[in-house]
UniProtKB/Swiss-Prot annotation:
Protein known as: Ras-related protein Rab-27B
Species this chain originates from: Rattus norvegicus (Rat)
Gene Ontology CC terms: apical plasma membrane; axon cytoplasm; exocytic vesicle; Golgi apparatus; Golgi stack; late endosome; melanosome; multivesicular body membrane
Annotated motif Effector region, positions: 38-46
Residues with lipidation of kind S-geranylgeranyl cysteine: 216, 218
Mechanisms controlling activity: Regulated by guanine nucleotide exchange factors (GEFs) which promote the exchange of bound GDP for free GTP, GTPase activating proteins (GAPs) which increase the GTP hydrolysis activity, and GDP dissociation inhibitors which inhibit the dissociation of the nucleotide from the GTPase. Activated by GEFs such as DENND10.
Compartment(s): Membrane; Late endosome
EC numbers on record: 3.6.5.2
Membrane topology: Lipid-anchor
Length: 218
């Protein structure tokens, strides 16, 4: 795909405590490489990737294929950058909420991140995937899978255990989030009867949408 040759521009935001592996996770997803020497993100950074999203009919048959330009925003986890980070929440259509499986504290702080999301995201119930990263460090693990799945069930969101080092579930977790977003947008399109192809500059927003309201469902 050339520049501008896409149907949707989707902005995803990775957030979580500093050091949970957001930067290496996104690098693995976009470049399929692992770089353990990334320095801590200062403020905001982002990576990009073009994908093709295939829809399915009600009977399970193949539907239309959409070309999607993903912008994956990488946020600083440190407290001093928190006000800058939350300023980007309203522009994101989906969130990769990440904690470190080798850090119980980063898992406990997921609740704080959820509170900030609910207060600052484009709506009160945005599309979120919970990610327990560094699954390859088995001997250092502090958070068990049951704990994490129970928390994800409480919030009604998918949960994945990932590893930027091995690539485990990295692509699958992002694809799951994209699927949630595209299905939500499809419902909006059906209700408002707007064209099914949205120019990238609109970021997938539907004509007539009221930005001031924080209702997610159309």
């Amino acid at each position: 795909m050339t520049d501008g040759d896409y149907d949707y521009l989707i902005k995803l935001l990775a957030l979580g405590d500093s050091g949970v592996g957001k930067t290496t996770f996104l690098y693995r997803y976009t470049d399929n490489k692992f770089n353990p020497k990334f320095i801590t993100t200062v403020g905001i950074d982002f990576r990009e990737k073009r994908v093709v999203y295939d829809t399915q009919g009600a009977d399970g048959s193949s539907g239309k294929a959409f070309k999607v330009h993903l912008q994956l925003w990488d946020t600083a986890g440190q407290e001093r950058f928190r006000s800058l980070t939350t300023a980007f929440f309203r522009d994101a259509m989906g969130f990769l909420l990440m904690f470190d499986l080798t850090s119980q504290q980063s898992f406990l702080n997921v609740r704080n991140w959820m509170s900030q999301l609910q207060a600052n995201a484009y709506c009160e119930n945005p599309d979120i995937v919970l990610i327990g990263n560094k699954a390859d460090l088995l001997d250092q693990r502090e958070v068990n899978e049951r704990q994490a799945r129970e928390l994800a069930e409480k919030y009604g969101i998918p949960y994945f255990e990932t590893s930027a080092a091995t690539g485990q579930n990295v692509e699958k977790s992002v694809e799951t989030l994209l699927d949630l977003i595209m299905k939500r947008m499809e419902k909006c399109v059906e209700k408002t009867q707007v064209p099914d192809t949205v120019n990238g500059v609109n970021s997938g927003k539907v004509d007539g949408e009221k930005p001031a309201e924080k209702k997610c469902a159309c």
